[in-house]
A protein has these predicted regions:
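Short C-terminal tail/terminal secondary-structure segment
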Residues: 1-3, 149, 228, 239-252
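Canonical Rossmann dinucleotide-binding motif of NAD(H)/NADP(H)-dependent dehydrogenases/reductases
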Residues: 3-36
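Active-site helix of classical SDR
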Residues: 124, 160, 168
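Alpha-helical segment proximal to the catalytic Tyr-Lys
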Residues: 129, 173-177, 236
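Residue(s) in the substrate-gating loop at a strand-loop-helix junction
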Residues: 144
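C-terminal helical subdomain
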Residues: 184, 207-238, 247
Length: 252
């Protein structure tokens, strides 16, 4: 039987080496993709590259700060030199500042919007141009349930993810005639460092799990599975969609 999730030697750019980006890079590499992983944090890059090597795969890495348009475009150019023109793109760059609206500083807003939304636009535009030229591409953004739900103390993050959801839909509409699909995965509460930091600050794990119909937190690998599906040709007729990987969180 043919493996419809194979990504044999497909040039793949993954931006963001944290929990979800790193897990997705490993999943894509395991399916045969030729992965370049880009992040500002060298320790994260090294950890994912080691994990890939231990599993018998290779992930090339590139350290880059993605807070300006010029830096994003330069990172794409350099990453293409590592893998070739991308057929798969994943944006998993982001941060969250948890503060009430009245306590937010200007830099909290600017930094969160820049990393979560502006970098998605700059990188998506640069990679999209290459995909449209070649009339093929699988583009995936990591959104969040916060793009739909009104979580207190999440205003910049929610604005960024909500904006991302509309932005990628426009990309999907414009690029569909060129064989480029554009989708997003929207995780709920996942076992990542961000969630660990939240719980370490005295928040109750059981109360968090009680908000999820599945009654548990998700795992990075479960988000990575959704990313891998959307990167494959099995998802060739799916575009402009948000795939919620949240154990039912948006249902309640």
């Amino acid at each position: 039987m043919q493996d419809w999730l194979t990504l044999d030697r497909r040039p793949t750019l993954v931006f963001g080496a944290g929990g979800l980006g790193g897990a997705s890079a490993l999943s894509l590499a395991a399916r045969g993709a030729r992965v370049a992983l880009i992040d500002v944090n060298q320790d994260n890059l090294d950890a994912v590259a080691r994990a890939a090597k231990e599993a018998g795969h290779e992930i090339k890495t590139l350290a880059a700060d993605l807070r300006t348009a010029e830096a994003c475009r330069a990172a794409v150019d350099e990453a293409v030199g590592l893998t070739g023109a991308p057929q798969v793109f994943l944006h998993a760059v982001g941060r969250n500042v948890r503060k009430p609206v009245l306590d937010l500083e200007d830099e909290d807003w600017a930094e969160t919007i820049s990393l979560n939304l502006s970098s998605a636009y700059w990188l998506g535009q640069a990679v999209g141009r290459l995909m449209v030229e070649r009339r093929y591409g699988r583009m995936i953004f990591v959104s969040s349930v916060s793009g739909l739900l009104a979580h207190p103390h999440h205003a910049p993050y929610a604005a960024a993810k909500g904006g991302m959801n509309q932005m990628f839909r426009v990309m999907a509409r414009e690029w569909a005639p060129y064989g480029v699909t554009v989708n997003a995965v929207a995780p709920g509460y996942i076992e990542t460092d961000l969630t660990k930091d939240y719980l370490d600050k005295g928040n109750n794990r059981e109360s968090l799990e009680s908000l999820v119909p599945a009654e548990r937190l998700g795992r990075p690998e479960e988000v990575a599975d959704a990313v891998t599906f959307l990167a494959s040709d099995r998802a060739r007729f799916i575009t402009g969609q948000v795939l919620y990987v949240d154990g039912g969180r948006v249902l309640v």
